[in-house]
């Protein structure tokens, strides 16, 4: 039995060595299959996606400033407050504006009365011309009757001279009356009272004063959230003083900074998937490429890089790509300006344009909150004109 055992002992390592070779072969084949599968997956799928985490949420920041100078009496909104379009944000002291408005109304009433008097004078001066014409005709008639009598020596020369002087005087008075009438007409230009230049100018001053009074109430031009409030009650502000900012929660987008080696296949309209740090992988935003910027970030910086130097080092540049977000998703999962995102662009479809070639036909944004209707002040002006026109 010992002899049989001695002859079988060397066969065990041979069997183990064969198993090890087969295992290594299987692992090698498995790795090759996985590598090929990954290669195929990259060729068919992954190579059509460009990804970057150098991407941040951007949005509109509406800087609130006053349109008139004044002293702040009330501040109606603070940081993080929600405001609607047309809500009052800041109130200025209206005393000076109200005084200017009252002064403008008084000036309009005075201008209407003066202009109305000029129009009345025009009728009086026209009547005076008729009177002077009659006087001239009478003087001329008297003189004509006396000429034959003077030639026949039936009246004295002095009386004839007096008649001649009366004609000259009447003619001079008629000329003066005509000049006065023309001068008065030049003042009123033969137009209606409300269309007179002096009245129009005074009415414009009333409108300006009324607008200044209305603008002591600083309102929000858009619906959004208040940020960066700097104004305080009692502060003296001017039209260039930043008061606060209003940030709309809608119409946000992502500025993704892709390397210049990633943008060759990017086109306008390509679909984008966005993941944010604030919500993580639980929320996937969908969007699309709406445009590629016309310059890299360094090219538009305050101090552009100077590459014409001896120690130049090449650095891969990044180009901002603007990505539009789904507004419904924004309403459900609101974002904030400056948040970090991970962006993946599907570049499979390359039928779109690299650069936009259509002119925008609609406004990017519209706000009518600060448009002030002049109907109330125009009615007030009409009432003042009627009340002082006599």
Curated annotation (Swiss-Prot):
Q: Which residues lie on this side of the membrane: Cytoplasmic?
A: 1-24
Which of the residues are on side Periplasmic?
46-390
Q: What is this protein called?
A: Multidrug export protein EmrA
Q: Which domain of life is it from?
A: Bacteria
How does this protein assemble? Answer: Homodimer and homotrimer. Part of the tripartite efflux system EmrAB-TolC, which is composed of an inner membrane transporter, EmrB, a periplasmic membrane fusion protein, EmrA, and an outer membrane component, TolC. The complex forms a large protein conduit and can translocate molecules across both the inner and outer membranes. Interacts with EmrB. EmrAB complex forms a dimer in vitro.
Q: Tell me if Lipoprotein is a UniProt keyword of this record.
A: no
Segments passing through the bilayer: 25-45
Q: Which GO terms describe its cellular component?
A: efflux pump complex; outer membrane-bounded periplasmic space; periplasmic side of plasma membrane; plasma membrane
Keywords (A to Z) from UniProt: Antibiotic resistance, Cell inner membrane, Cell membrane, Coiled coil, Membrane, Transmembrane, Transmembrane helix, Transport
In the record, the note on similarity to other proteins reads: Belongs to the membrane fusion protein (MFP) (TC 8.A.1) family.
Q: Where in the cell is it found?
A: Cell inner membrane
Coiled-coil ranges from the UniProt annotation? 120-180
Pfam families given in the database record = CusB_dom_1, HlyD_D23
Q: Name one GO biological process term.
A: response to steroid hormone
The gene behind this protein is: emrA
Q: What does this protein do?
A: Part of the tripartite efflux system EmrAB-TolC, which confers resistance to antibiotics such as CCCP, FCCP, 2,4-dinitrophenol and nalidixic acid. EmrA is a drug-binding protein that provides a physical link between EmrB and TolC.
GO MF assignments: bile acid transmembrane transporter activity; identical protein binding; xenobiotic transmembrane transporter activity
């Amino acid at each position: 039995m010992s002899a049989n055992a001695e002859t079988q002992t060397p066969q065990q390592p041979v069997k183990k060595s064969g198993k090890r070779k087969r295992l290594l072969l299987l692992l090698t084949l498995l790795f090759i299959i996985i590598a090929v599968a990954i290669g195929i997956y990259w060729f068919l799928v992954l190579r059509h996606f460009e990804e970057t985490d150098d991407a941040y949420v951007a949005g509109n920041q509406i800087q609130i400033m006053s349109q008139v100078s004044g002293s702040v009496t009330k501040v109606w909104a603070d940081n993080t407050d929600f405001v609607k379009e047309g809500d009052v944000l800041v109130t200025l002291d209206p005393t000076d504006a109200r005084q200017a408005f009252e002064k403008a109304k008084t000036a309009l009433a005075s201008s209407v009365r003066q202009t109305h008097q000029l129009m009345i004078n025009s009728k009086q001066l026209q009547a005076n011309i008729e009177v002077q014409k009659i006087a001239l005709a009478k003087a001329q008639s008297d003189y004509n009757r006396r000429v034959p009598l003077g030639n026949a020596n039936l009246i004295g020369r002095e009386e004839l001279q007096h008649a001649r002087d009366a004609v000259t005087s009447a003619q001079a008075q008629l000329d003066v009356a005509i000049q006065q009438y023309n001068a008065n007409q030049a003042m009123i230009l033969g137009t209606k009272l409300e269309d007179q230049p002096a009245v129009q100018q005074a009415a414009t001053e009333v409108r300006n004063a009324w607008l200044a009074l209305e603008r002591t109430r600083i309102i929000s031009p858009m619906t959004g959230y208040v940020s960066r409030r700097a104004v305080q009650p009692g502060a003296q502000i001017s039209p260039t003083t930043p008061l606060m900012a209003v940030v709309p929660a809608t119409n946000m987008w992502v500025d993704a900074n892709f390397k210049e080696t990633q943008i060759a296949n990017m086109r306008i309209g390509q679909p984008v998937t966005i993941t944010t740090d604030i919500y993580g992988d639980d929320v996937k935003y969908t969007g699309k490429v709406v445009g590629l910027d016309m310059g890299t970030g360094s090219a538009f910086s305050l101090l552009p890089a100077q590459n014409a130097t001896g120690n130049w080092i090449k650095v891969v540049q990044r180009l901002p790509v603007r990505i539009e977000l789904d507004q419904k998703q924004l309403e459900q999962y609101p974002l904030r300006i400056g948040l970090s995102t991970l962006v993946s662009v599907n570049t499979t479809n390359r039928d779109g344009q690299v650069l936009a070639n259509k002119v925008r036909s609609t406004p990017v944004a519209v706000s009518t909150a600060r448009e002030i209707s002049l109907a109330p002040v125009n009615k007030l002006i009409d009432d003042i004109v009627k009340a002082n026109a006599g």
